[in-house]
Every structure is written in structure tokens, then in C-alpha cells.
A protein has these predicted regions:
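Sec-dependent signal peptide cleavage junction
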Residues: 22-61, 65-66
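Extracytoplasmic/periplasmic, Sec-exported soluble proteins
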Residues: 80-87, 125
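Bacterial Sec-dependent N-terminal signal peptides
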Residues: 1-31
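Generic structural "secondary-structure junction" signal
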Residues: 60, 85, 116-118
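Compact alpha-helical subdomains of small soluble proteins
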Residues: 98, 102-153
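Solvent-exposed, polar/charged alpha-helical surfaces in well-ordered, non-transmembrane soluble domains
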Residues: 85, 89, 93-97
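Acidic/histidine-rich, surface-exposed loop or edge segments in extracytoplasmic proteins
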Residues: 67-81
Length: 153
């Protein structure tokens, strides 16, 4: 009899611990003063991501992104293309899912789907800029497009 009570108490404790751990706030990594200034920019900023040899182009019209890319993002060569491709796949899947759910996610943030095919080699530059846009976007708007926190360092 006591054994059954102990099992019930243990089960309740485990479930409570699990719920508390899972419901914790998932905040974006700390934002520096310099990064906040870039996020608060008002100047128009357009970045065109393209790979001339493969004829792929992405146009990002996001105020502050180009400045952030030049001043805060990790430099080219810091990440491998494979790393960025893997992260971009996860980010794109989550992004596109949010585009399809405008009642659940802000349709002003998630306007258009991204066509990113996993078996196409878009090249380093396209992956670099797309990856960094996802990091910028998550940090600026306090969003999570994957299971990992969007960090710079």
C-alpha cells in the first residue's frame, strides 16, 4: 500500500518537474547595446543575395540588416557551408510553417514562404547571408525558428 502511494508521489513530482522545465521562457541570447542601435535604425536597407552561376536570388528589404551583417554578424568563413545549410533547412521549415498559420504567428513578420531546396547547392554566399538574416530576424523580433538560441558568438 505504501509502495503505491510512493509511486504516485514520485510520478507527480516527475511530471511537475517536467512541466516546469518545459514551460520555462525561451529568450533570445543577450542583445548588446550596439545591436539594439542597429535594430532601431530607420534608414531603408536592402540586401540582394544572389549566386550568379546558379541564378538564385533573394531580396531582403529589412531596415538595419545590412548594417548588422557588416558590423555584428560573424565574418565570412566563420561557419562552414554545411553548418549553415543544416541550420537554414531548419529555419526555412519553421518559417514556412509560420507563414501558413497567420492566426497563430504575426503575418506582418511572416509574409512569404521561402523556397529553399535541401539538395541544391546555393553556394557559400547565399547560405551565409540567409543564415545571418535568420539570426538577425530572431534576435530583433525575439523569435525562435529552431531548437537552439540564435547567438552570434
Amino acid at each position: 500500500m505504501k509502495f503505491k502511494i510512493l509511486i504516485k508521489i514520485f510520478t507527480v513530482l516527475i511530471l511537475t518537474t517536467f512541466i516546469i522545465q518545459c514551460s520555462g521562457s525561451k529568450k533570445v541570447a543577450d542583445i548588446s547595446k550596439e545591436e539594439k542601435e542597429v535594430f532601431n535604425q530607420k534608414d531603408k536597407d536592402t540586401v540582394i543575395i544572389k549566386n550568379d552561376s546558379l541564378e538564385y536570388k533573394i531580396i531582403i528589404m529589412e531596415i538595419g540588416f545590412n548594417t548588422w551583417l557588416q558590423s555584428i554578424a560573424q565574418p565570412r568563413g566563420y561557419y562552414t557551408q554545411e553548418f549553415m545549410e543544416n541550420r537554414n533547412r531548419i529555419f526555412v521549415i519553421n518559417w514556412n510553417q509560420r507563414v501558413l498559420e497567420p492566426m497563430r504567428f504575426d503575418p506582418n513578420l511572416y509574409e512569404l514562404q521561402i523556397n529553399y531546396e535541401p539538395f541544391i547547392d546555393y553556394g557559400y554566399e547565399v547560405n551565409y547571408q540567409l543564415y545571418n538574416y535568420f539570426i538577425y530576424f530572431q534576435r530583433k523580433y525575439n523569435q525562435r525558428l529552431g531548437p537552439f538560441a540564435p547567438r552570434i558568438k
